[in-house]
Design a protein with these regions (language model features):
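Acidic/His- and Gly-rich active-site-bordering loop/insert found
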Residues: 46, 72, 93-135
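A non-catalytic alpha/beta surface segment that caps or lines the substrate-entry region
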Residues: 54-108
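Second-shell loop/turn segments in exported
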Residues: 24-33, 49-59, 89-94, 139-150, ...
Length: 251
């Protein structure tokens, strides 16, 4: 298990480390890389003003799902979900049913046996949208565009999908890329994926969740829970990903 998790963890590195970095000394050397430029473009698109913060069930969340689906198609990533994503409903107390969606892409593993086992990489589609606040005694509507939460995670998701598709010969297991809707509504998209949509949950060997990756400082956190294998991988890589030093947080 440690071996394939190591491959998965290393697949995350190219998002931050381009070929330029091998001769560089800091994050500044990454600024001109094609991958970083692509990530920035994704973040701009997914946090655009017209999406109004991608609130669960909103037109903005729908457009974000369509954007992720479009990127998967352009990158040659196969889709498990139908065009427009897989719809599901969330019952609201005393209100109408909220309709959200998941978009799931995949890159099939090369091993004839292990391709039936799965690694899941996921990121939430939605943010909190708009909120009315009181400023100087007057109601003011504020839009939470969600560049960090979670356009950053979605941007990495689609770029990782591209990289895994390009380097599919490295992956014995099938890798699923899941953009999950309605996370701010009791994580409904994740629940729907595990309990209604995907029939082979017992074959999922590892899962990485990408959330709020734009930390604003030179570092990132790896929340591994109680996964002993992943803890070992993070501890090993923390000494190798210069100048990146993951801080391990268990819970």
């Amino acid at each position: 298990m440690k071996r394939f998790i190591s491959v998965l963890a290393l697949a995350l590195v190219p998002m931050l480390l381009s070929a330029q970095f091998r001769n560089g000394t800091g994050y500044g050397d990454l600024d001109d890389s094609e991958t970083v430029a692509a990530v920035k473009a994704h973040v701009r698109s997914l946090s655009a003003a017209h999406l109004e913060g991608r609130k669960a069930g909103s037109e903005g969340e729908k457009e974000a799902a369509e954007y992720v689906e479009q990127m998967f198609r352009e990158y040659g990533v196969d889709l498990l979900t139908p065009a427009g994503g897989e719809l599901f409903g969330v019952m609201k107390d005393g209100r109408d049913t909220l309709t959200s969606r998941n978009v799931i892409g995949y890159v099939e593993g090369y091993d004839k046996t292990l391709r039936n086992d799965y690694i899941v990489v996921a990121a939430r589609l939605d943010n909190i949208g708009t909120m009315t606040m009181t400023v100087d005694g007057k109601p003011v509507e504020r839009v939470f565009y969600g560049a960090n939460g979670n356009a950053s995670g979605l941007a990495m998701l689609v770029e990782l999908a591209r990289m895994v598709r390009t380097n599919s010969m490295m992956f014995r297991r099938t890798v699923l890329f899941a953009a999950l809707g309605a996370s701010n509504e009791t994580f409904a998209g994740a629940w729907y994926f595990l309990n209604r949509s995907f029939p082979e949950t017992d074959r999922i060997d590892a899962m990485v969740n990408l959330d709020m990756l734009g930390t604003g400082y030179n570092g990132f956190y790896a929340y591994t829970g109680s996964n002993v294998d992943m803890n070992a991988v993070v501890n090993t890589l923390s000494g190798e990903l210069q100048p990146i030093h993951p801080e391990l947080v268990t819970g």
